[in-house]
Design a protein with these regions (language model features):
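Extended alpha-helical targeting/anchoring segments
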Residues: 1-187
């Protein structure tokens, strides 16, 4: 409900010709967050991840790039409570973003990274056995969907921006994201 209350103050009209995301919350809900939505599920705190259960950031400014059309959008939302003042402020913010984007930035080279030993939280045999259990639960009608995963970890000696750039080049996806804040970095 808290998220809905905040978003109620940020309603924007649909405007043709611009990306559908013009602001709002960006972030993630971790797998362990399900314990708050489905109290009937038993949660084992000893198996919790090191990630926060969720991390949301509220944006009222967006720089979006349409890779298909090779077009950049600078979107600044304007609050309507003091329209003239807020509109002028938004124009200044757009000008500042344009200046920042137009400035010369040194291209960071791809850096050969060293990946440490890849470790899993379970053996291949255990994973396969658990997938079979999941299929049985679905077939029996106990559940209709299971998002079962296997956690892999490895030490990585570069920042994740480098990994993100490599992934974006070798295996692009419309859902790719690089998120970095004080607590966590995800690519």
């Amino acid at each position: 409900n808290c998220i809905k209350e905040v978003l109620a103050e940020y309603r924007v009209p649909k405007i043709g010709g611009i990306p559908p995301l013009t602001g709002g919350f960006v972030g993630y809900f971790g797998y362990d967050f399900v314990q708050y939505c489905e109290p009937s599920l038993q949660f084992d705190p000893t198996k919790a991840t090191d990630f926060p259960d969720f991390d949301l950031m509220l944006f009222d400014k967006i720089v979006a790039f349409d890779h298909l059309k090779q077009k950049l959008f600078i979107i600044v939302n304007v609050r309507t409570d003091n329209l003239e003042v807020n509109y002028a402020k938004a124009e200044r913010e757009i000008t500042a973003v344009e200046a920042l984007l137009s400035s010369s930035v040194a291209q960071r080279p791809f850096i050969a990274a060293k990946l440490g030993e890849v470790k899993s939280n379970q053996s291949k045999d255990l994973y396969a056995a658990n997938v079979q259990k999941c299929k049985k639960y679905i077939k029996n009608g106990d559940v209709f969907q299971i998002v079962y995963s296997q956690k892999f970890t490895a030490d990585y000696d570069q920042d994740l921006f480098n990994a993100y750039r490599i992934l974006r080049t070798t295996n692009p996806s419309q859902y790719m994201v690089l998120m970095k804040n004080d607590d966590v970095e995800i690519a």
